[in-house]
């Protein structure tokens, strides 16, 4: 007898998506307004030059800012940022500055000056939005080229994650406000 049970299709993505939850930051130079949102779906898509994909619904203010200004930040929150991550992913920033609302301190990115977060977080990237593709319209997927990146030296060692301290670990959203952290490193061979 099989131990497998049917999964409702609206939960099927959760079977694959246990990668790190990220915070997407954006800034409108004209109005001087900034925004931050949580996103469960992001991934690298090219090594050279480094390029990434993020999924941001076209109805969001974040998407408007990114498409208007052509740039965005990706912040990788740590366990200590769980409450921030859930909060900024649960409300729109169209009518309020979520950085101020939740007391999230900001650092400025070195290339675009994007709002980024280091406190309670493990890494960040500044990205330039790549020209629109059909995936952008059909699937809400935006592609960006990474122009600057930094990571906490306690957890990113010699080009890879090293999660020896449970408090310095990435968050992985399982849905409905439930998160897990990364496991222990296992080496093949």
Swiss-Prot record:
> SMART domains annotated for this entry?
Flavin_Reduct
Question: What cofactor(s) does the depicted protein rely on?
Answer: FMN
Q: Which InterPro entries match?
A: Flavin_Rdtase-like_dom, Flavoredoxin, Split_barrel_FMN-bd
> One MF term in GO for this entry?
oxidoreductase activity, acting on the CH-NH group of donors, NAD or NADP as acceptor
Q: What Pfam family does this protein match (any one)?
A: Flavin_Reduct
Which keywords appear in this protein's UniProt record, sorted alphabetically? Flavoprotein, FMN
Presence of keyword Flavoprotein: yes
Q: Which family does it belong to?
A: Belongs to the flavoredoxin family.
**Which PANTHER family did the record assign?**
FLAVOREDOXIN, FLAVOREDOXIN-RELATED-RELATED
Query: What protein does this entry describe?
Result: Uncharacterized protein YddH
Q: Which gene encodes it?
A: yddH
């Amino acid at each position: 007898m099989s131990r497998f049970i049917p999964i409702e299709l609206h939960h099927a993505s959760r079977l694959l998506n246990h990668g790190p939850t990220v915070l997407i930051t954006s800034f409108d130079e004209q109005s001087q307004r900034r925004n931050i949102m949580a996103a469960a779906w992001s991934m690298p898509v090219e090594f050279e030059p480094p390029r990434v994909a993020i999924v941001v619904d076209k109805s969001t203010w974040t998407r408007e800012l990114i498409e208007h200004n052509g740039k965005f930040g990706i912040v990788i929150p740590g366990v200590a940022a769980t409450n921030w991550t859930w909060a900024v992913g649960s409300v729109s920033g169209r009518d309020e500055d979520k950085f101020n609302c939740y007391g999230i301190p900001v650092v400025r990115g070195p290339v675009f000056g994007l709002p980024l977060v280091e406190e309670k977080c493990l890494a960040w990237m500044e990205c330039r939005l790549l020209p629109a593709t059909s995936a952008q319209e059909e699937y809400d997927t935006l592609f960006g080229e990474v122009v600057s990146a930094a990571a906490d030296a306690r957890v990113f060692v010699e080009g890879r994650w090293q999660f020896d301290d449970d408090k310095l670990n990435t968050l992985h959203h399982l849905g409905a406000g439930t998160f897990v952290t990364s496991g222990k490193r296992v080496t093949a061979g």
